[in-house]
């Protein structure tokens, strides 16, 4: 695979982005989706510790606001799918949530066995995650659409002096606007609305400039939105030239991983970080990969 150099303006744009936002130093490649979720219950401490031991670059996770204004790590809106509890996450206090079995429904054999049921795995708070893994970078999706969540979230991040190792994400533009206002030095992705706006502009011929002040530092997108193909060579080149990173979610197929890396994806979300590590190890990528892109 040939990796031709970007022009000088694009390289300067990447350099500026990296200097201003330390989360991208060094730029991540492997984002473990909800931790090592292939082998452990997702978004739990064992999944996070395993991901750290695998030396992944970033753990991707999700947070909700609890009924007592704390921040709990969990993906789903409800508790029914993964725990022995039931109901909306945000209706419970952190203490109540931590009484639930977060490994209750984890299975690798279509429900024949539940190896983590009753082993003491509970939901955890954002505070616990940052305390337990002080050197890990986190990509955190703020799920609750509530103005109190960004406030409490940045308070906890500040308490742990963790701003440089957090990338804030959310489907809700209001959450990201609040994060950028409350903690301007924190890296953020683009919301769904922001991505869609940039996508449409790019399709209409808009070419983003490295001189523009973008709200976020990274586009985190699927390869397709329904019938729309997002990741084209033109799309990737346009935003790379403007200094914007591109992360792709969620890829678990080896052939897809190889293809996206060769296209120039900066990082990939995966449930199977072991496989992605193997793929990266087999593809000859130069050390200065993030200053080069595939044609």
Question: Which residue ranges define each predicted feature?
Answer:
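Metal-dependent phosphodiesterase/phospholipase catalytic core, i.e.
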Residues: 19-28, 75-182, 208-242
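Glycine-rich, proline-tolerant flexible connector loops at the mouths of alpha/beta enzymes
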Residues: 65-77
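Glycine-rich beta-to-alpha transition loops that act as phosphate-gripper elements at the mouths
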Residues: 34-35, 42, 170, 194, ...
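Catalytic domains of carbohydrate-active enzymes, especially glycoside hydrolases
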Residues: 50-63
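Short, positively charged and aromatic/hydrophobic N-terminal segments
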Residues: 2, 7, 11-14
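Hydrophobic faces of well-ordered beta-strands that scaffold small-molecule active sites
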Residues: 30-32, 59-61, 138-140, 166-169, ...
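C-terminal active-site rim and adjoining tail of enzyme catalytic domains
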Residues: 199-295
């Amino acid at each position: 695979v040939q990796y031709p150099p970007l022009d000088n303006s694009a390289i300067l744009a990447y350099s500026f982005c990296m200097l201003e936002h330390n989360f991208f130093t060094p730029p991540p490649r492997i984002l473990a989706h909800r931790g090592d979720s292939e082998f452990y219950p997702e978004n739990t401490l064992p999944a996070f510790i395993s991901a750290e031991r695998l030396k992944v670059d970033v753990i991707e996770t999700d947070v909700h606001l609890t009924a007592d204004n704390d921040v709990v790590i969990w993906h789903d809106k409800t508790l029914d799918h993964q725990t022995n509890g039931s109901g909306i996450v945000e209706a419970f206090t952190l203490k109540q949530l931590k009484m639930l079995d977060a490994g209750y429904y984890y299975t690798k054999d279509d429900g024949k066995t539940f190896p983590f049921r009753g082993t003491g795995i509970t939901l955890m708070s954002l505070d616990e995650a940052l305390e337990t893994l002080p050197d890990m970078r986190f990509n955190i999706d703020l799920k609750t659409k509530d103005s109190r969540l960004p406030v409490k979230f940045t308070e906890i991040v500040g308490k742990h002096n963790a701003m440089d190792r957090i990338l804030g994400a959310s489907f809700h533009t209001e959450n990201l606007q609040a994060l950028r206002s409350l903690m301007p030095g924190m890296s953020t992705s683009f919301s769904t609305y922001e991505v869609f706006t940039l996508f449409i502009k790019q399709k209409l011929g808009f070419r983003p400039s490295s001189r523009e002040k973008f709200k976020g530092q990274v586009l985190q997108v699927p390869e397709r939105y329904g019938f729309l193909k997002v990741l084209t060579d033109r799309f990737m080149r346009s935003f790379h030239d403007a200094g914007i990173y591109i992360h792709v979610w969620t890829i678990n197929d080896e052939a897809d991983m190889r293809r996206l890396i060769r296209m120039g994806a900066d990082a990939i979300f995966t449930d199977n970080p072991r496989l992605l590590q193997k793929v990266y190890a087999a593809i000859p990528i130069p050390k200065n990969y993030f200053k080069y892109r595939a044609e």
